[in-house]
């Protein structure tokens, strides 16, 4: 097993104003997430979220970050959520094993001492997209079947943003310390996500772009302040960090899906500030 965790520091809008393309990608993009047999994580100082991919093949994988986090075990002071976007797999939580079908997920409580990920078929491995945030108390762990998610149709064909938002971890349906997580699927023939744009000063957010409608699909993701936007081109299964001051929207050459995850001081989903189209630069 290879384990890799990189650190991305927090930056002010004035800092990123001077970044060239390579610098912007280095500071906000996670390019390699699902590597067979590996764990690939990013620790962003934006609200101290840890996110990335766990891709077990022949051997189960466990995230161990006690030394890096100054704790006795990974989730001693953290909670964790994941969504499986690969083949069938299992997760063993403190000795209890559960099946995890494609597109199913899990919320795992602070205080959980062992989380072991495995694939049912090594030739078609599970791809666990994991997100962990700081926690102050333990809430019950919960298995999250895709069929039970809260589905929200959004947008329309005329604006090329017809999509369905599937809420997995949401304050309206379950208790967490701060983690929110979901999966958005664009309908065929649609390309824009989160447009009109918004910001939410009390939360940061990561996007994992996945399930592209065509192998050659690419997504241009926009971030930065509304009056000074930047863009990053993403390939399948790449993720981007959006600071709390930043817009976060994208447009693809065909349809696609993405997993969003948020954390911060406010869990109200609608706590956001809309950006007028005339203000975008």
From Swiss-Prot:
Pathway connected to this protein: Glycan metabolism; pectin degradation; 2-dehydro-3-deoxy-D-gluconate from pectin: step 4/5
Enzyme superclass (EC): isomerase
Alphabetical list of Pfam families matching this protein: KduI
GO molecular function: 4-deoxy-L-threo-5-hexosulose-uronate ketol-isomerase activity; zinc ion binding
UniProt xrefs under InterPro entries: KduI (IPR007045), KduI/IolB_isomerase (IPR021120), KduI_N (IPR027449), RmlC-like_jellyroll (IPR014710), RmlC_Cupin_sf (IPR011051)
Amino acids binding Zn(2+): 198, 200, 205, 248
Family of the protein in this entry: Belongs to the KduI family.
Species: Levilactobacillus brevis (strain ATCC 367 / BCRC 12310 / CIP 105137 / JCM 1170 / LMG 11437 / NCIMB 947 / NCTC 947) (Lactobacillus brevis)
Coiled-coil stretches: none
Domain of life: Bacteria
Protein name: 4-deoxy-L-threo-5-hexosulose-uronate ketol-isomerase
Task of the protein: Catalyzes the isomerization of 5-dehydro-4-deoxy-D-glucuronate to 3-deoxy-D-glycero-2,5-hexodiulosonate.
